[in-house]
Design a protein with these regions (language model features):
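Catalytic pocket of metal/acid-base enzymes, prominently hydrolases
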Residues: 1
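Catalytic pocket-lining loop regions of alpha/beta-barrel enzymes
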Residues: 4-8, 19, 25-183
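Catalytic donor nucleotide-activated moiety binding site of glycosyltransferases and closely related
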Residues: 11-13
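Short histidine/acidic/glycine/proline-rich micro-motifs that form metal-
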Residues: 15, 43-44, 189-190
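His/Asp/Glu-enriched, well-ordered alpha-helical/loop segment
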Residues: 180-206
């Protein structure tokens, strides 16, 4: 964006072809000046924690860039039998983020790439206490084999989450994992009500 150097771009990379995704991530960061890549929370043939995607995370760690996981892909989540859309949208954002984070913990993504930085976006923060509680129970049962306590994966500087100031769960989440992982989400460049868009942004050129 030419409007301000404070705006940074994230690349969309072809996750269906991991070698091409690695090459595109490298090009986006080293040639185009982007700061990372956005990938879908679900909808791929395999979970984001599948080994075939690990070269992407390895490259992101090597480049010291971020990976953003975006909620909102409603496929294969059981919403196809809902009779109204609001329930799909309400759950379709946080649920796949919870699934993605769970897989990345239990399948060892962060154990393999401890400096990988991942942001979980558009799903709020309410899902975080739930999976921490549930996964800690699995660790206590001896069924979840991780190199660290579950909470550490949220507080080590690798995990980030987009949040909104009016979330009821936000204060509890901050008490649980601290404020550092929480990023205020403006949802720029779109807004549900155009009158709320600051006048200074109306002239932004892409």
């Amino acid at each position: 964006l030419r409007r301000s150097p404070r705006f940074k771009a994230m690349a969309l990379i072809p996750m269906q072809d991991p070698p091409s995704a690695v090459a595109e991530l490298r090009r986006a960061v080293t040639e185009l000046g982007m700061v990372g890549a956005y990938i879908p929370s679900n909808g791929l043939k395999k979970h984001l924690s599948a080994k075939e995607f690990w070269p992407i995370y390895e490259e992101a760690q090597k480049l010291d860039c971020a990976v953003g996981i975006h909620g909102g892909s409603y496929s294969d989540l059981g919403f196809n039998t809902f009779t109204k859309f609001p329930g799909t949208r309400a759950l379709g954002m946080p649920v796949p983020l919870a699934i993605a984070m769970t897989g990345m913990i239990q399948d060892g993504v962060w154990d393999a790439f401890p400096k990988l930085r991942v942001g979980f976006m558009e799903g709020g923060t309410g899902w975080i206490p739930m999976i921490i509680d549930r996964l800690e129970r699995e660790q206590e049962y001896g069924e979840l084999h991780c190199q660290r306590p579950v909470l550490d994966y949220f507080t080590s500087g690798s995990f980030y989450v987009g949040c909104e100031g009016n979330e009821r769960a936000l204060s509890n989440v901050v008490n649980l994992i601290g404020p550092q992982p929480c990023m205020f989400a403006s949802d720029f460049p779109h807004d549900l009500v155009v009158q709320r868009v600051p006048l200074g942004l109306l002239g932004v050129e892409l």
